[in-house]
Amino acid sequence: MRTIGMSDYTVGEDCFDELPGALAEYGATKVAIIGGKRALAAALPGIEAALEGTDVEVLETRVYGTNSTRANIAKVVNSPACQEADVLIACGGGKALDTVKTAAIELKKIVFTVPTICSNCSAATAIAVVYNDDGSLEGYSYPNRPAHIFINPKIIAEAPAEYFWAGVGDALSKQPEVEYATSAGNLEHTAGLGLALAHTCSEPLFTYGVQGLEDVRQDLSSEAVKQIALDIVVNTGYVSNLTNQNDYYYNSSVAHAFYNATCSIPREGTYLHGEVVSLGVLVLFAYTGDTENLKRYAAFNKQMGLPVTLEQVGLSESDIPALCEYAHATNEWKQGNPEPFTDEKFAAAIKAANAYGRTL
């Protein structure tokens, strides 16, 4: 038996007007609101205005921390207000949302998400990333998908532009990773549906990405910003839920194996998830020998200011042996779809992508 649930979503600058009705669908009268400090400052006024005059009680507003670690997850789990709430409203980027989603597993709570940045698809997914206290990857948790997503393009447009930029970088991976992971064929219905939807993920980025980034840099809520936010949160989020099931995993591949391995390499500087993943996409195309898409995506990375070389993410070719070693521990490497990954091919792909990037 397989049951597939997908998040409802409301998009628009007036999206919070739908919040009381969405809560009523679940009989919810008590909520706790958890998120990043900046995210709460952006989202709370709209949430509170929408709930004013209703029978919904806000039991707590909590800053979750700064990363989705076990310690921060435990703080949510141990909060009396979160234990009492009918619904947890998670506000912020991927790390804030993943913290709340993971805590909700133990608390057995419904989660609504408010992505105040669109740096990844966490607002829609039934998967969450958990990090160690030192920032290295611990692994994944598998919560229920959020029940409802509230996407406010104005909040996203007024957030720091680097998160929008990195979100485009992360979303660039969805279509090629799923296409490669499923390329052996013989897909059952749900995975096939995920692949069909994956085919819709890249073109909106090429169409609206440059304009959207320009608009976000001017704090301008525009059609381009909305289209990119929908693509990152909804398109790629739905694909994630359809391509990640108990009996198969096609949700990520070489690009995320590369990113996850980099998390264990000590180096100066900080690099956003999607920033590094976008370079991993070039590694993926080098790995598969897809020169046409390597050139296309690399040109787009260059146009967007996303990385095209190892040096741009604080790495060098001397790190490649360690990247191969750390990649072995990643879920992507263990799944090995459509066929087992090899150190030799992975190392050669990193070198080839880096060499091509240096020509741009």
Residue ranges of predicted features:
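A glycine/threonine-rich phosphate-anchoring loop and its flanking beta-alpha core
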Residues: I105-A198
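ATP/NTP phosphate-donor binding region
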Residues: M1-E84, L310
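Active-site segments that bind and position negatively charged phosphate/pyrophosphate groups
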Residues: E188-A299
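A short, small-residue-rich loop immediately preceding and capping a beta-strand
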Residues: P80-A103, L107-T116
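C-terminal charged capping/lid subdomain of soluble metabolic enzymes
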Residues: R2, E18, D290-L360
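Short glycine/serine/threonine-rich phosphate/pyrophosphate-binding segments
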Residues: F16, L40-L44, R70, K95-T102, ...
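Generic secondary-structure signature for well-ordered alpha-helical cores
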Residues: A24, E52, V56, G135, ...
